[in-house]
Amino acid sequence: MDKLILRHGAALKSKYGTAGLARIDAALRALVTADRRRGIDTLVLSVDEAAAMKAQGLAPVARTDAKSLKAAIDGLAGKLAPHYFLLLGAQDVLPLVPLVNPAYTGDDGDADKTVPSDLPYACEAPYSTDPARFQGPSRVVGRLPDPPGASKPDLLLQLIRAAARAEPLPREQFHTFFGLSAAQWQASTRLSLRNLFGQAEQLKLAPSQGPRWSKAELAPRVHFINCHGGDTSPEYLGQHGDDYPVAHRASLLRGRISAGTVIAAECCYGAQLYDPKDAGGHLGIALSYLADGATGFFGSTTIAYGPSEGNGSADLICQYFLQRVLAGASLGRAALEARQRFAGERTHLDPVDLKTLAQFYLLGDPSLQPVGFASHALAKTRAFKAAFAKVQDRGVRGLRRERLEREGLNLGRSLPRLRDSQQAPAASVEKVLRAMAKESGLDIRQVRRRSYVLQAAKQGPKVPARSIHMLKGRRTNGQLITLVATEQGGELLHVRRLHARGG
């Protein structure tokens, strides 16, 4: 089994009626046929239908039950071992898992009590709302969304049909980029773009640019965006001091996006799926991109973080995703490899990095390969083509999945877990942190602290007694600032400052 498309017939029928569901199923049959031509064996499975799930030895999934969906995916992974899981629909069709936000500090700080996430579906660990249990992703998972609350299936049909038509494009068509940044964060964004493309000359800054971008400006097939985003908002904002102008607007994308475009957005709520009725009838930016021909969107469901200079958290996971896409990976493999690299490069995941791992997810068919890669000379011979004509990439893909599964399992077994702690920092550490908070423009009387300890994984290395302290506060312009410090033996080992990408 190469690809498993999970649909919830009852939820789709409730949204779109019997006729709408029939149209969706017809489009899915066409996608299965297109996948077969691409060498991908695809099965569409109705997770709510008792007979279909009984045939797999599993219980059906209730409509809004993330726990049941997680159990079903775990069972299907064990029995069918698909190379790709495609979740069909938004969270009102197939739910996201409401993970507890490890960086939550109350309504005046990081107000996200939960982090809606697809990460648990990519992990072998059983259902939980503790994000620390999902530090070892090993499965390729993506979501082809529809608008929450929709009553007509037109957009979902459009996205399914676009996935059926999609083909890899030459690497040369991805040499240029559309880069957009809040002016306040341009140093960080320029570094990200140099890491991806070797230069950042085309970077657009808000203010004073945007949001009325021309078709030529939006034509590049890679978009990298580092702006402010907001809950249930169809806009991204720039920033310079206290000025927060609109930098990107969903309604202005129509007719301007090149087919096959791939986007990574660091913004808070950058890939949030919401009912358009809650935003004046406007789709979010992520869905608007897909509706206009983009192939994949990698972004966050909640408040995200990164530094104003240098790279960290959202900067890194977005870079890693695009690097793998540009190297010829499928969208889903790029997302999985980005998650694994992000988690694997760290001794431990602090509360902000743990939230980052949980909140970024893929919108798009995970099996699609946007960028074609150059074949080795042997692959061009007649003997090679004859030998692999019926399986194409399947054998090599299976080897890659073995490696990725091993990497994920090793991460899950070895990374220490974050646990809440009531222990205050050592006096010398607290003094330094308070001074840093003050120099960061925060009113120390309004700063909130949350502390943690690290718990060694059962099969991981021993972890010295080590504490993590997170301080959050807002500047006079309302911007949320976070200091994350690592303490060991009363000594300050490491500290970093992060800015919320909106919120």
Model-derived regions: residue spans:
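Active-site-proximal C-terminal subdomain of hydrolase catalytic domains
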Residues: 51, 92, 266-391
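Structured catalytic cores of large enzymes
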Residues: 5-23, 34-36, 41, 52-199
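A short, surface-exposed interaction/processing loop segment used at functional sites
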Residues: 478-503
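Catalytic-core segments of thiol-dependent peptidases
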Residues: 72-95, 167-168, 173-278, 283
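Extracellular pro-sequences of secreted precursors
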Residues: 1-37, 69, 401, 405-410, ...
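Short, non-transmembrane alpha-helical segments in secretory-pathway proteins
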Residues: 418-456
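Exposed beta-strand-loop-beta-strand "reactive/processing" segments of non-cytosolic proteins
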Residues: 447-487
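Catalytic cores of nucleophile-dependent amide-cleaving enzymes
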Residues: 111-156, 226, 231-317
